[in-house]
Amino acid sequence: MVAQRYRTRFAPSPTGYLHVGGLRTALYNYLFVKKMKGDFVLRIEDTDRSRRVEGAQQNLLKTLEWAGIVPDESPELGGDFGPYIQSERLEIYKKYCDELLEGKYAYYCFATSEELEENRQLQLKQGLQPKYNRKWLPEEMGGSMPSSEIRKKMEQNAPYVIRMKVPDYVSVWFEDLIRGPVEFDSSTIDDQVLMKSDGFPTYHFASVIDDHLMEFTHIIRGEEWLPSMPKHLLLYEFFGWEPPKFAHLPLLLNPDRSKLSKRQGDVAVEDYIRKGYSAEAIVNFVAMLGWNEGEGTEQEVYSLEQLVERFSLERVGKAGAIFNVDKLNWLEKQYIKSRSADRIIAVIKPLLMAELEKRPTAMHESVITSDLYLEQVIELMRERVGFEHEFVTFSPYFFFDPETYEEEGVRKRWTAETNTLLREFVTVLASLDAFTAEAIETELKAFVAPKGLKAAALIHPLRILCSGVSFGPSLYHMLEVLGKDAVIRRISRGIETVVCLS
C-alpha cells in the first residue's frame, strides 16, 4: 500500500496585511509538511467580497516569498487541484450544496436581516445563546415550515440563504494533534449558513469542500477556529468523507497576556519589514511563538532549514504564546553578528547612495562607498547596531562630517586647556606615516603622559569632534577607518565650533 502524500495549506483572505499570526500559521504548515517531504499549498479564500482589499493578494504572496515560505501550488504556480482562488470555484460549491439539499442536510432560509436581529435580541434578553430559530426549517426535515410556503418564496424570487441542518443532541468529537480529545454538544451549534444570498459560499462550507477536494491530510490553523470544528466535522459526515487531521495553534498574546492586537503594537508583518527586521529573524522568532525544540537544547537561533528538520507538532504548546519584541530584537542582533559583510553591504550600499544624493559629504565618495571601506565600518559596528540600516543611520559620521556636537558631552569633557591640547595633538597626527589604531593610541598616550594627564583627557574630546557624539566603537579604530585627512579636518573645524558650547 502506497503511503498517502502529506499535504497542508495556508488559506488567507485578501483583506489587507498579513498578520504575524497568519505568518506563524503559514510557517508551521510549511515546516510540518516539508519535514514529511510533502506539498505546501497556498489557497486564497475570497468569498467575503465586502472585505476584499485591492492588492492584498499580491502583498500576501510577496510577504510569504520574503519569508522564504514558498508554496508548491498556488494561484500563480497552478497545480493539479486548482483553481486556487475560491471565487473561481463557485460552480463546485453549488454542486455540493445541491447534494446537501437533496440529502435533507440543508435547507432554504428566507429570513430577513431584521427578523434575524429581532430573534437575536430576544434570545439575549432570555439569557440564551443566540442561534437561528429554524423558522424556515421544512416540515419534512422536522421543522414547521410547509413546503408550499417555501415554493411560494422561490416563485417570487425572494432572496435566501442555504443553511445546514445540525442534528439535535449528538456529540461531535475529534482528536486535536495539539490539544488531544475535544468534544462538542450539537445543541450549542447554530444552523450555519452555507451559501449566502449573493451565491457565494461561507468560509465554513467552502473550506471543507476545498480541503477535501485538494486532498489535504492535515489542517493546521489558529485556536480561533476551534469553535467552528463541529460544523466542519458534520459537513464531512454529511458527505461521507474522511476528515483530515486537525491541529489548532495557541493564541498570540501581548506581554500582559491580552490577545495580540494593533492597539498594543504592530501586528502586520509588513510593519516589521519596514522597520528593518530581516526575514531570518522574523521567521526564527515566529517559529518559537508556541513551539520549542524541547528539554536538553539551548539553541535559540535557527535557520529555516534547521526549523524544517526539527519542527514537530508534538512540541507545540496549548497555552497562549507571548509576543515579546525584546526577544525579536535580540534575534535580529544575533543574525547581524553572524551575517557576512557582503550580504550587509548589499543592503546598506543603496541606503548610503540615497543619503549621498540628499546631502553633501566632505569625504571621498569613491572611498566611503567602496566595499573595503564598508567592511571596516561593519566590523566596527556589528556589536552596536540593531538593524542593518543602522550601519548608516546610527553611525553617519563614517560618511558625513558632523554638523552638530553633543552639548552635554562638550560641557562634561571640555576644560580650559582642551582646545589647546587638541591643536597640539593635530600636529602629532599629521606627522604620522602609518595612520593606524595602534600608532594613534601610542602617540596619544605619549602626548598626555608628560603633561600629567590621563588618556581620557583627549579620548572623549576627539570622539565628539570626529563623530559628533560621546559614544561609539573604539576611538582608535574609528579614527583609523575615517582616515588622516578626515580626522584632521574634523578636529580643526570642531575646535572652532565647541568654543561656543564649552
Curated annotation (Swiss-Prot):
This is Glutamate--tRNA ligase. GO terms for molecular function: ATP binding; glutamate-tRNA ligase activity; tRNA binding; zinc ion binding. PROSITE patterns: AA_TRNA_LIGASE_I (PS00178). One of its GO terms (cellular component) is cytoplasm. The keyword Calcium does not apply. Its main location: cytoplasm. A motif ('KMSKS' region) lies at residues 259-263. Belongs to the class-I aminoacyl-tRNA synthetase family. Glutamate--tRNA ligase type 1 subfamily. Pfam families: Anticodon_2, tRNA-synt_1c. ATP binds at K262. It comes from Chlorobium phaeobacteroides (strain DSM 266 / SMG 266 / 2430). A motif ('HIGH' region) lies at residues 12-22. It comes from the Bacteria. GO terms for biological process: glutamyl-tRNA aminoacylation. Monomer. Its EC number is 6.1.1.17. It catalyses: tRNA(Glu) + L-glutamate + ATP = L-glutamyl-tRNA(Glu) + AMP + diphosphate. It is an enzyme of class 6 (ligase). It is found in: Cytoplasm. Keywords: Aminoacyl-tRNA synthetase, ATP-binding, Cytoplasm, Ligase, Nucleotide-binding, Protein biosynthesis. Catalyzes the attachment of glutamate to tRNA(Glu) in a two-step reaction: glutamate is first activated by ATP to form Glu-AMP and then transferred to the acceptor end of tRNA(Glu). The keyword Lipid metabolism does not apply.
